[in-house]
């Protein structure tokens, strides 16, 4: 009877060990993030999907992001996205090279004003010339 319990315990630990070691080295793309972190989510293997201008959640890059981008009223890749969604006329990209999308603003000056209040001045210069 003791050997059956011991064998069951060994199988349980072996199975658990297999699942735990499969994710070793893989990036954990869970939790809260900010599009202003560099890199967002602590690694460039994950994407920060904003739910607000300052806060988002980390996810693995996939088609899920594209769907979230299309559905979110303020996420954009171009000025045309903002006009199509009715969220503004200008797509102000985050001053973070790891974020390939932006946020809709009414105008370029509104975006520059907003980002100038929350980002270092030297970083803003490189963004406004892009």
Curated annotation (Swiss-Prot):
Q: What protein does this entry describe? A: Albumin-1 D
Q: Which UniProt keywords apply?
A: Disulfide bond, Knottin, Seed storage protein, Signal, Storage protein, Toxin
Q: Which Pfam families is this protein grouped with? A: Albumin_I (PF08027), Albumin_I_a (PF16720)
Q: Which residues form a coiled coil?
A: none
Q: Which organism is it from?
A: Pisum sativum (Garden pea)
- Removed propeptide positions: 64-69, 123-130
Would you indicate the residue range of the signal peptide? 1-26
Other remarks on this protein: The protein sequenced in PubMed:3755437 was probably a mixture of the products of genes C and D, PA1b being of C origin while PA1a is of D origin.
- Name the job this protein performs: PA1b binds to basic 7S globulin (BG) and stimulates its phosphorylation activity. Involved in the signal transduction system to regulate the growth and differentiation as a hormone peptide. Toxic to various insects through binding to a high affinity binding site in the insect gut.
MF terms in GO: nutrient reservoir activity; toxin activity
Q: In which tissues is it expressed?
A: Major component of both the cotyledons and embryonic axes of mature seeds.
Query: Got any disulfides in this one, which pairs?
Result: 29-46, 33-48, 41-58
Keyword Signal assigned: yes
Q: What is known of its domains?
A: The presence of a 'disulfide through disulfide knot' structurally defines this protein as a knottin.
Q: What does the PTM comment of the record read? A: The C-terminal glycine may be removed from PA1b.
Q: Which InterPro entries match?
A: Albumin_I (IPR012512), Albumin_I_a (IPR032000)
């Amino acid at each position: 009877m003791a050997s059956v319990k011991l064998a069951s315990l060994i199988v349980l630990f072996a199975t658990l060990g297999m699942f735990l070691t499969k994710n070793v080295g893989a990036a954990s793309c869970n939790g809260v993030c900010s599009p202003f972190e560099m890199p967002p989510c602590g690694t460039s293997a994950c994407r920060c999907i904003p739910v607000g201008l300052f806060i988002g959640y980390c996810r693995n890059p996939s088609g899920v992001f594209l769907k979230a981008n299309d559905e979110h009223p303020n996420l954009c890749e171009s000025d045309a996205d903002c006009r199509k969604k009715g969220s503004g006329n200008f797509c102000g990209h985050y001053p973070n090279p790891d974020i390939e999308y932006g946020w809709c603003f009414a105008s370029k000056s509104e975006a520059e004003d907003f980002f100038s209040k929350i980002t270092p001045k030297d970083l803003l210069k490189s963004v406004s010339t892009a």
